[in-house]
Each structure stands twice: as structure tokens, then as C-alpha cells.
Amino acid sequence: MTRSTLDKLLPGCIVLLAIFAGIAVAAQAPVTLDHSIRDYKLPSEIPWVERNGTGSLTLYGDERKPGGIYVSLLRRPFDNWSAPHTHPTERYVTVLEGTFLASTGPEQDRNRVEALKAGTVVSEVPGRMHYDGVGQDGVTLFFIGMGGANTGRASEPPRAPGGPNVDPTARVAKKLEDMVWSKAADGSTYTNVFGDPSKAGLYVQFVRRPANNWTTAHHHANDQFIWVMGGRIYIGTGSTVDKNKTVGLPKGSYIHDFANGTDYEGTKDEDVWLLVTGMGPA
């Protein structure tokens, strides 16, 4: 190759190198979502408040204030027990990890409990007494309920011998293996564990998305609160679905979708399992 030929090719090569460098920089640039539409926390970003071996965090609202919903987390160590107590308002507890030892009644009997594993959702009936403990692997719990749920004591007759460990008139536990799933038009599957997102009231729903499954851009009438139970979800904001302008969130991440904000989400090379909660209609 002659010198004159090289001189002719060199400018074009420089341009191509600049283009490729620009593409590489763009590919590596971090994606920033509109946090007024959708906020999130990675597992390492959750600011647990530790006290006497127990971690807690209010994600939304205030359980002491009546009239609104609240969302919170609780992490308890092995052999941590509550005294029998009640709550005056509706609430739902999802076991995220570990073993939740649940029971009902005014007298604590640690041999009369039901061991509930990850994926179990418990409905606690207002005004009914219950207590709980923690298995050897600890437990992490996700709560959604109506405000005013300060713990209190009440008078209730002792439970008669026999019968189930958990009185279903006081506490209803739905285990993952017993849930019935339906297939949505977009290829995902879901189960409405308690409530229904299309109707008024609190709801708790599980959603599973296969690999390479995406929603359209959409919005919700009310705030929605999501926990990644397994896999990785990719989330974006805005009215145009752009799979390259998303943030990947692994198991243990939390998402808050604000009412009427337009967003989208999907999966890439693996399935995802989501806990979806809120106040309907969604």
C-alpha cells in the first residue's frame, strides 16, 4: 500500500474510530430513570434500622396514622417471639425469606405454630389475637396495611385444644404451593393472593414473567409497591419502551410506582418473580 493510499484512508479510519468510541461510551453510560414516576432501591441501598438484632424500615406511609396505607419491612432473628396482640386494621404479611412461625389466640404456645416459608402471604383479621416467632433461618417480612395498626392487647377466650395451629377466623395463611395461577395476555402469569388490583381495596398479587417478556408503556391509578422475589426485572420510565434505557434490579430490590406515571418493565435472559401490592383499582 502506497503512502498516498494511506493518506486517503486515514481520515476515514479516524472517523470510524470516533464513531465506535462514541457507541462504546453511550453503551456504558448509566441509565437514569425519572424518579418522580418510579423510584427503586437495590438490596444494598435499603436503609435498615437495626435495634436489638431486629431490622425494620417503613417504605411508605405511617402505620400509626389512620386513613392511609403503609408499606414496611421487618427482619427478625431466630427465636424472636412476639407476645399475643391484635391490630385494629386490615393488613397483609408476605414472607420474603426464612421461616415465619405463626399462631393465633391469647396465650402463647410455641408448640402450636405453623411454619410458613417464603412466598406465603398472611391476612391478619382486625381485632383478633395472634402471635408469632422465627425459625432457625431467621425471617424477612413485607407488610402492607391500613394506617392505625399500632399493636395492642385485647381480651379473647383461650383456644380449645385440638384444631389447626392457626385459627382461620383470626389469621389466613396462603402458601405458595396452594396458589392458583392465571395466564395474562402478555404471556406472564399471575395470582391474586388477596384482593384484586382491578377493584377497590388493598391487594396482594404475585406475577411471574418468562425470559424476554415485556410490558407496554402503562400507568396506574394508584401507587404500586413491588418486591423482586426472584430473578431480575428491568424497569424504565416514559411512554416509549426502550430496552436499552432500563435499570436491572435483582432479587431483594424494591420498586415504588407513583400514581399516573408512565413506565414499563420486562425481562431479558431469565425469569422473574414479583410481589405486587397496593390499593386498587390499580
How would you name each of these model-derived features?
Residues 77-78, 87-107, 210-213, 220-240:
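Glycine- and acidic-residue-biased ligand/ion/polar-headgroup-sensing regions
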Residues 82-84, 101-103, 124, 129-135, ...:
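Short beta-strand His + acidic residue motifs that chelate non-heme Fe in jelly-roll/DSBH
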Residues 106-127, 239-260:
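Short acidic-glycine-tyrosine-enriched beta hairpin
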Residues 27-70, 153-203:
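A short, N-terminal "cap"/entry segment at the start of jelly-roll beta-barrel domains
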Residues 126-150, 259-282:
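Ligand-binding loop in jelly-roll beta-barrel domains
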Residues 12-22:
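Bacterial N-terminal signal peptides
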Residues 70-87, 126, 203-220:
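Conserved short histidine dyad/triad with adjacent acidic residue
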Residues 2-14:
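Bacterial N-terminal signal peptides that target proteins for export
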